């Protein structure tokens, strides 16, 4: 149940009728009623809901917004069920203050819907693909990858909760120049390990981790590939190393609570001819031309600032060409929406990719790109640039060891993705109210403690229909119920905007309101009817808080 949306619809219908009555009475004039919104005001003194109808209607009516609002309010059917007060405020908002009766259906709905409270069917089963992380398989996962993992998985959870059929996908960059350099670097380490003279390319991979990888390769194959064809040797080394690296990436992501439905190989696009077909089809459509021995895509025809090479002068397709084929493949697999989580450094890639898809006949709006900014780790008040253990960048595995999965996932989605994130390791480890995830989890654990205490006294949470919920009249109780009632709307809004940071804000507010309620109201009150009602409220809070944390991929502990 979404009591907030139901109430908004009812108020919107009442305003529409009142505006029509005011027009019939000659008090206002308009040709067509504009699309207006009813929102929850941030300032509680402005009531429970505020409508902007009069502000939008003023120009047609040729009156001030306040005069239009006053005319509409005069013709509202009275009494409106559940409405305690209607007033014109500010420049012409129509504010509604409701009586507490409108909140009564919320708590029974929460207990009935349980782990699906907040879910909806907005997506109606439409197929959506979320591609995220897609890290370079030649290395380990860094903080940018970690933020992308938390962000992408939370977005996928949100879309599932609002009724989409979601596929999580990891794109394996196992083709192109980087893999060629990776193979040459592995080959050099292999030959060196077997006593041969060899040097790593200047732009190759110089990390010591390749020494260990080659050592395991030799343990399995010995010098079998020492005197073989160099191309075969590199192929075998790359195949072995990529399998190891991808296994490590997969394990790290699983430890982070992220699992994928599809691992898609870039090389498969070349092997199947999909890249060549995409280029040929763009050429047939008139969007490919030759210059300086290379083939170029006319990205400027679609609003980009410059055209882009798709085939180099040496005849090798670019990464962009493979990306065109990959995204075409996504739509060929039947996805109605395709969502990519990319680093902000890829912002220039968005317009040209959308242009290529449009050139191939696809609606570019079906591709949505969420860009995320950099992450900076702080420890002891200073930027932590390198791992103290390895001397290289801090990996996801090390972060999980340092602060735990829950804190890492929560911190990574606390801010909007296009904001730089300063990740304070000391704060993430602290067990205090200053730590946002600890604060929220502690609220859940405290609720569970209350329910255990009640059980020890022979008390259970009663069925909501058996509780006199109208007894919940304390301001702290009512504010808590209002926050619980706002959860379905919060999920829908966060899913629509692809903004999971809204959930962390909601979780913090819900935890704060619960702590205030706990301070103001004795849950296990002497009055048995009040006690029953408060137990229902506490259980509804627990369910809602757990549901928020689960969408974020964070556990809801029963003890802390």
UniProtKB/Swiss-Prot annotation:
Motif 'HIGH' region extends across: 135-145
Superkingdom to which the source organism belongs: Bacteria
Q: Which InterPro entries match?
A: aa-tRNA-synth_I_CS, Arg-tRNA-ligase, Arg-tRNA-synth_N, Arg-tRNA-synth_N_sf, ArgRS_core, DALR_anticod-bd, Rossmann-like_a/b/a_fold, tRNAsynth_Ia_anticodon-bd
UniProt GO cellular component terms:
cytoplasm
Reaction catalysed?
A: tRNA(Arg) + L-arginine + ATP = L-arginyl-tRNA(Arg) + AMP + diphosphate
The EC code for this enzyme is: 6.1.1.19
Q: Kind of enzyme, top EC level?
A: ligase
Q: Which Pfam families match?
A: Arg_tRNA_synt_N (PF03485), DALR_1 (PF05746), tRNA-synt_1d (PF00750)
Any one biological process term the GO annotation gives: arginyl-tRNA aminoacylation
Cited Gene3D superfamilies: Arginyl tRNA synthetase N-terminal domain, HUPs, Isoleucyl-tRNA Synthetase, Domain 1
> Which key words are in the record?
Aminoacyl-tRNA synthetase, ATP-binding, Cytoplasm, Ligase, Nucleotide-binding, Protein biosynthesis
**SMART domains, per database record:** Arg_tRNA_synt_N (SM01016), DALR_1 (SM00836)
Query: Where can this protein be found?
Result: Cytoplasm
- Where mainly located? cytoplasm
User: Which family is annotated?
Assistant: Belongs to the class-I aminoacyl-tRNA synthetase family.
Can you state the subunit structure given in the record?
Monomer.
Please state what the protein is called.
Arginine--tRNA ligase
Taxonomic placement: Bacteria, Bacillati, Bacillota, Clostridia, Moorellales
